Amino acid sequence: MIQFTDVVKTYQQGNNALNGATMQIEDGEFVFLIGPSGSGKSTIIKMITGELKPTSGTVHVNGYSLERIRKREIPYLRRTVGVVFQDFRLIDKMTVYENVAFAMRVVGAREREIRERVPYVLELVGLESKMDRHPNEMSGGEQQRLAIARALVNNPSTIIADEPTGNLDPERSFEIMALLQEINNLGTTVLVVTHDQNLVEIFNKRVITIDEGIVVNDSMEVEEDYEEDYYTDDYYGEEELTDAAE
């Protein structure tokens, strides 16, 4: 479970990134997090991964309390959270298999575990036939799938996807979201940070809207008053995405 209660985060310059943010995400939920640039979304992600602590308020992530967490416990917290970065952060000199295996070696997994787990995860994301390829030989959609595999390989209880469809065409975007839905169906909590209004509407999940460091809306749909401010221009054609959904 992820729980923020009256969370304030003040940076050294005196700017507040969060101003009393309160939200709770239960185990196994699929949630969209939306908001304009500078609203506090990145700060929330950094707190969930243990990179930042709150100035005041409480943050609980998968059994860990950020106010009381010890430095040596942070790596264990991070093992419960897999992050799919917007820029992928893949290692071009490594193969697909090696990119995913590297994420397991970093946390001390045994080679036997790696040989069993990596092929399973690559099959889950549809890259089992591309194990020997390098990231720079792959399409954007395939690179995104590889980034998801790497985030998933250590079996985290939570996946955070930061703008996972930002550089993809409508068809590839829908495929990536369908993959995240499949991962969620296996019991993993999924938090998707996005500006894509059409994806949010089509997948019809819980939406948490943040603005100026506070949660201003938390529901199964985006209130009309918020839509214009919190989304980019209509990047996807509604007809294209509807066809893909069918």
Predicted regions and their residues:
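Catalytic Walker B motif of ABC-type/P-loop ATPase nucleotide-binding domains
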Residues: 159-162
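Conserved ABC transporter NBD signature motif
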Residues: 57-65
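A short, proline-enriched helix->beta-strand linker immediately N-terminal to the Walker B motif
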Residues: 153-157
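Short coil-to-helix segment of the ABC ATPase nucleotide-binding domain corresponding to the Q-loop/switch region
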Residues: 94-102
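Helix N-cap at the start of a conserved alpha-helix in ABC-type nucleotide-binding domains
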Residues: 170-172
